[in-house]
Design a protein with these regions (language model features):
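Bacterial Sec-dependent N-terminal signal peptides
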Residues: 1-5, 9-53
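N-terminal regions encompassing targeting/leader/pre-sequences
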Residues: 1, 405-406
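Glycoside hydrolase catalytic-domain context in secreted enzymes
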Residues: 52-405
């Protein structure tokens, strides 16, 4: 016990002092960033990064279409009138209904899509004139991992000029946001997402130990600080949503992603997950998206590629082990996002499960945020689970049965 306490104290000292010191160095651009990151809350979930000129990084905020930016509100649809959805004082439900009534089918579809960023799907780091001819001319729900310093899987890190310093990175994301606000019909901002289970996935951000390593500390205050730093660094870089924490409960050490969980105890996962989310979402700096819902970490034979769990777990195990952390983090920390999992349970893929993603998650657990699918999970309904006859059917199942963000 004494040895364990000494180990915990040493690890806590390393993280809470050295990492905090590094984080403070990371945040020395604060004064510049205050000028760059001018934000307003849009429909209660999208954090709006107001745009700037593309010629250089300005010292003072100066929008291109200045006529859009009124005193106390923004004319997102450029019609010269304050629509209900543009009125920050209007009830949120009224704003949503007004916006939906103005959206075309194409615009609604695009808001359900996540686009991988630079060098993964996007070929451009900053908007070009060609963007008005692309799919995202009607807007896009989210752009994931844009300019975080990584390219396509397996390739070396990007040497893009906007990766660092933080002020330049945030300016570049502002430019991307400017396109969606100023150049699309309704001006709906996009959500800049990134990974963050051991710090923000960015070339220069603080790199923490794995979740499994952090879980061994059993230190709530420490994890809260990790969440606080992760959220703060993400916000300084211009990201608005971080895919963390992982709330899976590790029960089979053969599983290839075991290092990503806090541990084998659902109580431990819940306690540390609560603190991580509270830290990340402190002062509305970013949204936290917990994953993977649900029963993902105990695949049959620990075979990740199979994406199947039945009949590995009984209903009681699912409820007491795997649902428990999500219930508590949603209710006690106000988790804003949930990522659905690849696996099936009892023969039904979670990705298209109305029972799990609507009846249980939104009904019984009281979740009021958004649900995003894991990468390729929609496609897996066709290619892996075989519950859809083609890709169109896979999309239909995902939308009609669970209403998720693809």
């Amino acid at each position: 016990r004494k040895c364990f306490r000494n180990y915990e104290k040493t690890l806590a000292n390393i993280i809470s002092k050295q990492y905090l010191y590094r984080a403070n160095l990371f945040l020395t651009q604060k004064d510049i960033m205050k000028k760059l990151l001018i934000t307003s809350l849009f429909l209660g979930s999208c954090v709006l990064l107001l745009a700037q000129k593309t010629t250089k990084i300005p010292n003072v905020y100066k929008p291109v279409r200045s006529e859009m930016y009124k005193k106390g509100w923004i004319d997102f649809n450029k019609n010269g009138a304050k629509d209900t959805y543009e009125d920050p004082t209007a009830p949120i439900d009224a704003r949503i209904e007004d916006l939906l009534s103005q959206m075309t089918l194409e615009e609604k579809t695009c808001q359900m899509v996540t686009l991988y960023g630079y060098k993964r799907v996007l070929k451009d780091d900053l908007p070009t004139s060609e963007w008005k001819n692309q799919l995202w001319k009607d807007g896009i729900g989210a752009i994931d991992e844009h300019l975080n310093g990584f390219q396509q899987w397996g390739l070396p890190p990007s040497d893009n000029e906007y990766v660092w310093p933080a002020s330049k990175h945030a300016w570049a994301l502002n430019e991307v946001q400017r396109f969606f606000i100023e150049e699309t019909r309704l001006g709906i901002p996009t959500d800049f997402t990134n990974e963050g289970i051991r710090g923000v996935e960015s070339y220069k951000a603080t790199n923490f130990p794995t979740q499994l390593g952090l879980g061994h500390t059993w230190n709530r205050q420490l994890i809260h600080q990790v969440g606080l730093i992760t959220g703060r660094e993400a916000r300084m870089l211009g990201y608005t949503n971080v895919y963390a924490p992982i709330l899976d409960v590790g029960r089979d050490q053969r599983w290839g992603r075991y290092e990503e969980v806090y541990g084998e105890s659902p109580y431990l996962v819940a306690e540390l997950g609560i603190e991580m989310v509270r830290g990340m979402q402190h002062n509305h700096q970013v949204a936290a998206t917990g994953k993977h819902f649900i029963a993902y970490s105990n695949n049959k034979g620990a075979r990740e590629g199979m994406a199947r769990v039945d009949p590995q777990m009984s209903p009681r195990e699912v409820e007491m082990l795997h649902a428990y952390p999500f219930k508590r983090v949603i209710r006690e920390a106000g988790l804003l996002g949930v990522m659905s999992s690849y696996n099936d349970y009892d023969g039904f893929p979670i990705q298209s499960s109305y029972y799990w993603l609507t009846t249980r998650l939104r009904g019984e657990m009281g979740f009021r945020g958004y649900v995003v699918s894991d990468s390729d999970a929609v496609e897996y309904l066709y290619t892996k689970h075989g519950t859809a006859k083609d890709m169109k059917e896979a999309v239909r199942q995902s939308v009609e049965l669970s209403l998720i963000h693809i």
